[in-house]
Amino acid sequence: MRITVLRLGHRPERDKRITTHVGLVARAFGADEILIEGRDESVVESLRDVVNRWGGSFSVTDGIAWRDELRRFRDSGGKIVHLTMYGRRIDEVIGEIRSCERIMVVVGAEKVPPDVYDIADWNVAVGNQPHSEVAALAVFLDRLFMGEELEKDFGGRLKVIPAARGKVVLDRGL
């Protein structure tokens, strides 16, 4: 399964930290790439630096035209999941979604245009209450992969060695 996260409505002056966290969660929880509407070199550099140090093949692209990207993805056979508190409950649809080969997960920053609700194959709610898009993405990906993404070895230069106390980081010097 290939997962692309599309970050809609990124505003560089307001959303730098949250968009970075969306990217970090996407990478750590099993997505293959993030596409960011709008340009923000600092977010791109930050995420690429994490990939360089901690491993994986996660890619980051900013400045995308989201409507074109959604249409292109859908026309090529991919399925679109829009995370929104107004959608169907995650537990009702996650089984169907798991059967897809390519998924684009749409995560909004500001008010999401109605077109997104219409083009999405699934509008999915991780709870029907307001909360963070970072939390919604983490829960969605964890449910999608049934926790298996947490066992992945990213093959990076740095690797955390789980410890009951303190911080243990292995530097493999790659």
UniProtKB/Swiss-Prot annotation:
Q: Name one GO cellular component term.
A: cytoplasm
Record has Transferase as a keyword: yes
Q: Which keywords has UniProt assigned to this entry? A: Cytoplasm, Methyltransferase, S-adenosyl-L-methionine, Transferase, tRNA processing
Q: Name one GO biological process term.
A: tRNA nucleoside ribose methylation
Give the principal location in a single coarse category.
cytoplasm
According to UniProt, the reaction catalysed is: cytidine(56) in tRNA + S-adenosyl-L-methionine = 2'-O-methylcytidine(56) in tRNA + S-adenosyl-L-homocysteine + H(+)
Stored SUPFAM superfamilies: alpha/beta knot (SSF75217)
- Keyword Nucleotide-binding belongs to the record: no
The record's function comment reads: Specifically catalyzes the AdoMet-dependent 2'-O-ribose methylation of cytidine at position 56 in tRNAs.
HAMAP family assigned to the protein according to its UniProt record, in alphabetical order: tRNA_methyltr_aTrm56 (MF_00077)
Oligomeric and partner information: Homodimer.
Q: Which PANTHER family match?
A: TRNA (CYTIDINE(56)-2'-O)-METHYLTRANSFERASE
What protein name does the entry list?
tRNA (cytidine(56)-2'-O)-methyltransferase
Species: Methanothrix thermoacetophila (strain DSM 6194 / JCM 14653 / NBRC 101360 / PT)
